[in-house]
């Protein structure tokens, strides 16, 4: 194969990077891109033999035509030699490269394991599986002078990536919104052109026009004696500490001045031996946090600390920390096996990571790794070190704090960006505690072991805090272009800037601010104005309470169902039409419009599709097939500038958003057609005409781009039924959504792993839409929430739980029905719940005749009746009384706990509780009185009625006499009627057979003529009978009846 001279710009870029300790990026396009990897690695190593040779190769599932298993590769070579397809010692450069170099292969899904490691070269294949998180996580592991290589498949134009379907897009699609636009890919490709250390080449190393480093020139050789000012300062610091031990030996290990000062701060805290003290170290990636912690642990050992515990999300992340512990030991003169022993984990998941170090030089000392959840083993701890605290859930980090020295390190803007959450929440709480203790007493500097008895009570509730930050990178040189490019691309290092106009003139009233729709095509077009506005939006996200990650940027840009809105102050004409800084950013996701068939299939299988969080969740929780067919918008994020928080801007943005979707800004005239504000996509015809070597990839013309911001009247809204939100429940956030008329319908029973908060879903029905379904959902939610308060929601404060219950009642105000079927308690229901003995006990307790524990079994039911609105308005409790009843009755907390929670004395809490029971006892007594009263006749006392102001009629004798006569006449007629009916019954009971006429047809025939005449004349006819009947006398009838009565008496006597 003929050799070809490579472009001189390629070795120039690599050598410049090695010389200046800056990284380089190569994007190789082509199916044979892997064959150029050995060449690039060789150029890097030839520039400086001291360079890190190790290689990180990250991929999705399969490597590019080879296996990472050494034995499998050897077996394959043996088979090929047997077949005769290759010579015995034949090996191409690529095979030699993967066989001889130290390559760490890692799946993208397992890339967390590489945190804390450093490599000289990073190879990323399977571009379609790349995400912003993966880019930041892998690129940050490369040291200064190293190379990042991105491998792309063959294509005729890089613009094909604009329309490329990424793996993550599958999660963005929903049933109603499936058209994904890869805006992030376009912005990524355009950003390569502005990266001065990036070359885009084909698989034959021809430099393509897009390359940002296409004009690179070799730097003049660097003189060996030449040192930058920072290094000179560090050298002076090390020399000044040579006589101070052990600080001098340990600081000599530091790489930057920043790191040296951090180590000295740690040593100061260690030497003070202070209880309840926290040292928080925050920095970006590659600043030497783990190294500083490792050196400080070595200092703690030299100061005699016996029980040192180290924790991190995984022991594999502590590789650098333990490495520098041992470097510190070496500097202090410790020897392995003589002064200390190293114990590795036998757990296969931990990959033989170090989990324990036993030191036995002066006395027994231990450095022990613990899982973050094992905070209960810290009883004897003297020093606890938390590395990568941002990746550990906040509640767990809080549990790790105790009466001992705590060192905490966290990344504030790295691959996950979770350190912002840590700095906003945990460090802010510690800072507040520190300020509070400072106001309470001036003795806040040190609590030493000598006088700890004297001051222990003072500091039992607060921790002192010392904050350290590192800003000088160690892996690579300060001002590394790749770091700048990555921070700009993923908006990692955005900071919020105060508005100078507001400082002089004050903030505008919320009613003067307007909401605008952000056009995402323009926002992610990589134009300078758009980039500036995007950074301001992301700065609001980062400074808010949300946990941020780079992946959120791709969600914002590519997800088809997502929309962006910003609240802007009034535009000042003096600013020359400049877009003002946003006060509030809202990101929404359109959800719903799911077919009933899809819902039915998912519910029957117990599964749900991706996206459409609220529809699927509510359908699953309430087993309702109808709800998912409604269309709604979930507010994914709403971030207000913290400088102007609690000024009503967030509520104003929600109000305008609600008005927008209710159609209050829509132009209803028929002749106005809405404009199409989307940009033209790259077509197949356009791509077919291009050639990779002549591919002109550049920014879109600003004139062809749609406006960045659109008025609400310019963009017609989707027809929605409701607005919804899903967030981690905190008291302040719940208060905000409650004040904006949102109603809770779901509260997750298990807390979120990262934040420790329970996910809450709240809904708000838009005006003019059917709302009865929300009333029913809220009623069902309240019933379930009351039942679960003694289980997973037991840890809620009573005030927080009470606030949730009150917000669920707000749904009744939205109902079309004036009356609600909240059935109040009745006597029958009361008898089913409580026995007379129970009511007597309650009555005795309310009269202070019994102890609180005697009625303990009744309190849960009493609380359930009250909060279930079964007592109506008859029992009215104040807010504090309601909180006490809820805490004791539903959360099953004891009196002391609720007294401490409400900041009340215990005796006052008991007195208020007794007052609650008295009210309920009176209500039950009144209920029983009413039920008995209903069974009694209604006696009306004229004197009392006259006192009540009722009109009393005077007595009229004539009227009474007439009424009496009417009553007598009516009674007489009733008596006569009854007597007649009785006579009729007697007649009917007589035997009339003896009066029957014989059935003699001859006699009837003879008398027929006389019968017809009698019938016409309505007269009487006499018929002749065969024999004359003897007439019965009254005496005969009397004797017969008397005999009949005597016979039964005789038979009874005979029986006796």
From Swiss-Prot:
UniProt key word tRNA processing: yes
The enzyme's E.C. designation: 2.3.1.-
A Gene Ontology BP annotation from the UniProt entry: rRNA acetylation involved in maturation of SSU-rRNA
Gene inactivation effect: Leads to a strong inhibition of 18S rRNA synthesis. Deletion results in an altered alkali-soluble beta-glucan phenotype. Heterozygous mutants show haploinsufficiency in K1 killer toxin resistance.
Annotated positions binding acetyl-CoA: 638-640, 645-651, 739
Sequence positions bearing Phosphoserine: 1001, 1007, 1010
Top-rank taxon: Eukaryota
Catalytically driven reaction(s): a cytidine in 18S rRNA + acetyl-CoA + ATP + H2O = an N(4)-acetylcytidine in 18S rRNA + ADP + phosphate + CoA + H(+); a cytidine in tRNA + acetyl-CoA + ATP + H2O = an N(4)-acetylcytidine in tRNA + ADP + phosphate + CoA + H(+)
Subunit field text: Interacts with TAN1. Associates with 90S pre-ribosomal particles.
Name by which UniProt lists this protein: RNA cytidine acetyltransferase
Function: RNA cytidine acetyltransferase with specificity toward both 18S rRNA and tRNAs. Catalyzes the formation of N(4)-acetylcytidine (ac4C) at positions 1280 and 1773 in 18S rRNA. Required for early nucleolar cleavages of precursor rRNA at sites A0, A1 and A2 during 18S rRNA synthesis. Catalyzes the formation of ac4C at position 12 in serine and leucine tRNAs. Requires the tRNA-binding adapter protein TAN1 for full tRNA acetyltransferase activity but not for 18S rRNA acetylation.
Keyword annotations: Acyltransferase, ATP-binding, Nucleotide-binding, Nucleus, Phosphoprotein, rRNA processing, Transferase, tRNA processing
Domain N-acetyltransferase stretches: 566-706
Binding site for ATP: 286-295, 475
Family indicated by similarity: Belongs to the RNA cytidine acetyltransferase family. NAT10 subfamily.
Entry GO CC: 90S preribosome; nucleolus; preribosome, small subunit precursor; small-subunit processome
Compositionally biased intervals (Polar residues): 433-446
Effect of residue 637 to A: Total loss of 18S rRNA acetylation and tRNA acetylation
């Amino acid at each position: 194969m003929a050799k070809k001279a490579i472009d001189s710009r390629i070795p120039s870029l690599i050598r410049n990077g090695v010389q200046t300790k800056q990284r380089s990026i190569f994007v190789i396009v082509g199916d044979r891109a892997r064959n150029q990897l050995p060449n690039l690695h060789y150029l890097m190593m030839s520039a400086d033999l001291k360079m890190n040779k190790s290689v990180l190769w990250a991929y999705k599932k399969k490597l590019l035509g080879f296996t990472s298993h050494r034995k499998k590769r050897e077996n394959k070579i043996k088979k090929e030699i047997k077949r005769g397809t290759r010579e015995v010692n034949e090996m191409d450069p690529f095979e030699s490269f993967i066989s001889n170099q130290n390559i760490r292969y890692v799946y993208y899904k397992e890339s967390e394991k590489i945190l804390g490691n450093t490599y000289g070269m990073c190879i990323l294949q399977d571009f379609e599986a790349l995400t912003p998180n993966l880019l930041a996580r892998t690129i940050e592991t490369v040291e200064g002078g190293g190379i990042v290589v991105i491998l792309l498949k063959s294509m005729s134009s890089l613009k094909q990536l604009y329309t490329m379907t990424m793996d993550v897009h599958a999660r963005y699609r929903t049933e109603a919104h499936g058209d994904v636009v890869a805006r992030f890919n376009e912005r990524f490709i355009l950003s390569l052109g502005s990266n001065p250390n990036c070359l885009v080449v084909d698989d034959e190393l021809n430099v393509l026009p897009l390359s940002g480093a296409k004009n690179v020139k070799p730097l003049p050789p660097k003189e060996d004696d030449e040192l930058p000012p920072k290094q000179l300062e560090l050298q002076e610091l090390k020399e000044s500490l040579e006589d101070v031990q052990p600080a001098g030996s340990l600081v000599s290990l530091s790489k930057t001045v920043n790191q040296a000062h951090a180590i000295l701060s740690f040593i100061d805290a260690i030497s003070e031996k202070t209880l309840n003290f926290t040292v928080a170290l925050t920095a970006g990636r590659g600043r030497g946090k783990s190294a500083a912690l490792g050196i400080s642990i070595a200092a703690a050992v030299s100061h005699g600390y016996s029980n040192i515990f180290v924790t991190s999300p995984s022991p594999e992340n502590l590789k650098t920390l333990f490495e520098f512990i041992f470097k510190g030991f070496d500097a202090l003169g410790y020897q392995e096996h003589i002064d200390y022993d190293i114990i590795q984990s036998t757990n296969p998941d931990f990959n033989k990571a170090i989990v324990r170090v036993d030191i036995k030089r002066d006395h027994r000392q231990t450095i022990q790794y613990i899982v973050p959840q094992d905070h209960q083993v810290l009883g004897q701890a003297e020093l606890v070190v938390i590395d990568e605290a941002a990746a550990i859930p906040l509640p767990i980090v809080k549990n790790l704090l105790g009466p001992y020295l705590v060192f905490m390190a966290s990344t504030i803007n790295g691959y996950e960006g979770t350190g912002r959450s840590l700095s906003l929440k945990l460090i802010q709480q510690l800072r507040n505690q520190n300020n509070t203790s400072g106001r309470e007493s001036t003795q806040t500097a040190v609590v030493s072991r000598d006088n700890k008895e004297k001051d222990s009570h003072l500091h039992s509730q607060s921790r002192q805090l010392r904050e350290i930050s590192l800003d000088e990178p160690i892996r690579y040189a300060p001002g590394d272009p790749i770091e700048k490019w990555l921070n700009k691309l993923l908006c990692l290092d955005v900071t919020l800037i105060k508005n100078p106009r507001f400082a002089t003139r004050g903030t505008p009233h919320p009613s003067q601010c307007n909401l605008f729709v952000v056009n995402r095509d323009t926002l992610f077009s990589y134009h300078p104005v758009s980039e500036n506005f995007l950074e301001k939006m992301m700065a609001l996200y980062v400074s808010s309470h949300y946990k941020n990650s780079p992946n959120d940027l791709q969600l914002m840009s590519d997800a088809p169902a997502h929309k962006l809105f910003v609240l802007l102050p009034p535009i000042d004409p003096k600013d020359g039409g400049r877009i003002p800084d946003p006060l509030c950013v809202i990101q929404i996701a359109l959800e719903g419009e799911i077919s009933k068939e899809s819902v039915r299939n998912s519910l029957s299988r117990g599964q749900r599709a991706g996206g459409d969080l609220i529809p699927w969740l509510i359908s699953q929780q309430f087993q309702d097939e109808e709800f998912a067919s409604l269309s709604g918008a979930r507010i994914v994020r709403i971030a207000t500038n913290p400088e102007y928080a609690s000024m009503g801007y967030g509520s104003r943005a929600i109000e305008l958003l609600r008005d927008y979707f209710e159609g209050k800004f829509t132009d209803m005239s028929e002749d106005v057609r809405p404009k199409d504000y989307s940009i033209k996509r790259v077509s197949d015809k356009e791509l077919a005409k291009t050639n990779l070597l002549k591919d002109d990839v550049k920014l879109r013309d600003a004139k062809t781009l749609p406006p960045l911001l659109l008025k609400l009247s310019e963009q017609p809204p989707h027809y929605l039924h409701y607005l919804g939100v899903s967030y981690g429940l905190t008291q302040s956030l719940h208060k905000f959504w409650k004040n904006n008329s949102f109603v809770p319908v779901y509260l997750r029973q298990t807390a979120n792993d990262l934040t420790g908060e329970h996910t809450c879903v709240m809904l708000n029905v838009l005006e003019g839409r059917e709302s009865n379904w929300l009333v029913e959902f809220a009623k069902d939610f309240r019933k379930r929430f009351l039942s679960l308060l003694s289980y997973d929601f037991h840890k809620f404060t009573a005030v927080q739980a009470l606030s949730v219950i009150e917000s669920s009642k707000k749904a009744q105000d939205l109902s079309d029905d004036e009356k609600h079927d909240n059935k109040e308690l009745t006597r029958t229901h009361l008898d089913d719940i409580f026995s007379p003995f129970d009511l007597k006990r309650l009555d005795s307790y309310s009269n202070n005749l019994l102890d609180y524990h005697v009625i303990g079994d009744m309190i849960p039911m009493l609380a359930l009746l009250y909060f279930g609105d079964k007592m109506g308005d008859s029992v009215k409790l104040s807010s504090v009384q309601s909180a006490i009843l809820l805490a004791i009755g539903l959360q099953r907390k004891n009196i002391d706990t609720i007294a401490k929670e409400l900041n009340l004395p215990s005796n006052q809490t008991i007195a208020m509780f007794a007052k609650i029971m008295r009210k309920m006892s009176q209500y039950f007594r009144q209920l029983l009185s009413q039920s008995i009263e209903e069974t009694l006749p209604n006696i009306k006392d004229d004197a009392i009625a006259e006192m009540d102001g009722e009109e009393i009629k005077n007595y009229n004798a004539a009227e009474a006499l007439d009424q009496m006569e009417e009553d007598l006449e009516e009674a007489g007629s009733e008596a006569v009627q009854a007597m007649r009916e009785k006579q009729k019954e007697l007649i009917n009971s007589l035997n009339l057979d003896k009066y029957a006429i014989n059935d003699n047809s001859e006699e009837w025939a003879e008398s027929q003529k006389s019968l017809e005449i009698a019938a016409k004349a309505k007269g009487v006819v006499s018929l002749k009978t065969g024999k004359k009947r003897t007439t019965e006398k009254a005496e005969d009838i009397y004797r017969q009846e008397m005999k009949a009565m005597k016979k039964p008496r005789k038979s009874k006597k005979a029986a006796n």
